[in-house]
């Protein structure tokens, strides 16, 4: 199965976000003059302490929040609101409870006007990436939390977005399931090569997944660190790996200094 993603780059240039805080009675800057270029097919983790601007930045890229200054472009096209060129996976299981699993995954292609039969085939293709093609006719409430989040990931991918935005998608599952989901995501990424921005509080998760780890502090980029680890990555091989531990320690020290 080859990649279905066009060669497009995400460029964040001098982006700021300011809002009025009624409790403080003044404007507050959540994101300050951030510049970041993400090449097509890169996997970028964004990590930092609570309140550093991670989710605010993701919401501006998604088009959910307007920017206060700067620009965010996919190639030369400015982002002015939500669009099918960006897929979003949230921490909560944001599936339609009245639709089957297959209908959830095929929803994006269906909204693009593709025939139902083709959408059903697309849904099965993407569900097979996470071994869930057998639950296509079930409803979300019949699945475990980990299975629901797998469906959420492939539902976002099935619409072939230029950029996949993931906001702490594995935070609400248990540790063992989280590690399995992380390994599955890296396998999907290697096979499909979508561009991914992954928000997390978890330093080890950020290093395990990414090509680059971006550390945010007080709304600014504190560090943009390349991760030189071979792929494919599995926890069994990396958990005691000296390079992995050294990189995780470097990122953790940056986060603690933020």
Where does each model-flagged region fall?
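Helix-to-loop junction immediately C-terminal to a conserved catalytic motif
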Residues: 62
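Conserved ABC transporter NBD signature motif
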Residues: 70-82
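Short coil-to-helix segment of the ABC ATPase nucleotide-binding domain corresponding to the Q-loop/switch region
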Residues: 99-106
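Conserved ABC ATPase "signature" region
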Residues: 106, 110, 115-134, 187
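Catalytic Walker B motif of ABC-type/P-loop ATPase nucleotide-binding domains
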Residues: 164-167
